[in-house]
Amino acid sequence: MNPILINKLQRKLGYTFTHSELLQQALTHRSASSKHNERLEFLGDSILSYVIANALYHRFPRVDEGDMSRMRATLVRGNTLAEMAREFDLGECLRLGPGELKSGGFRRESILADTVEALIGGVFLDSDIQTVEKLILDWYQTRLDEISPGDKQKDPKTRLQEYLQGRHLPLPSYLVVQVRGEAHDQEFTIHCQVSGMAEPVVGVGSSRRKAEQAAAEQALIKLGLE
């Protein structure tokens, strides 16, 4: 690992690892090594969900479970995590195999999002739950301040469907146009055709569902609803 880039990353994260091997593992995609980050990602995903749920519970004492679930989903979804990864310049620190490097894996949203979760898992193992909770809340401060309950927290497919139904327009159609990668690490490309749009919008994700959500979000942006 390039020590200059790693030090820069740790400054942006706001955390310096005591055990550098945890940081290295968190940054390692399965295409690069058998000692990859998927177990850390599993751990980090659960920790992130808990921290954000706890924060929302205390910030919104009068909001019901449904709205809190939708707000949490917005905050922990893949494109939000990928945005954070780009803010950290995480792509330049990833350890990828030759195939992933060639295909631009350092830019792929699913890899960036998974690595953020792996970093959370790594920080927890390197420190404790109090430290990682404070760090996550620091990362999310602006997003937590800006989020609010309401229809905007519904997932993009639901919002797009409700928008079209409200105008008596046909429902959108979703078509898988490409599946890349091996079974354990696939990337789906979806075309979403919306009535009134000359061309389909495109969504990419690590599952068909995530790719459809990404395509629906692009449709909402084109409709001026995002």
From Swiss-Prot:
Its annotated compartments are: Cytoplasm
Q: What class of enzyme is it?
A: hydrolase
One Pfam family recorded for the sequence = Ribonucleas_3_3
Required co-factor(s) are: Mg(2+)
Keywords carried by this UniProt record: Cytoplasm, Endonuclease, Hydrolase, Magnesium, Metal-binding, mRNA processing, Nuclease, RNA-binding, rRNA processing, rRNA-binding, tRNA processing
The record's section on InterPro entries has: dsRBD_dom, RNase_III, RNase_III_dom, RNase_III_sf
Question: Transmembrane segments in this chain: where?
Answer: none
**Domain DRBM as annotated: residue spans:** 155-225
How does this protein assemble? Homodimer.
Q: Which PANTHER family match?
A: RIBONUCLEASE 3 (PTHR11207:SF0), RIBONUCLEASE III (PTHR11207)
Q: Which family does it belong to?
A: Belongs to the ribonuclease III family.
List the protein's name: Ribonuclease 3
Name the gene behind this protein: rnc
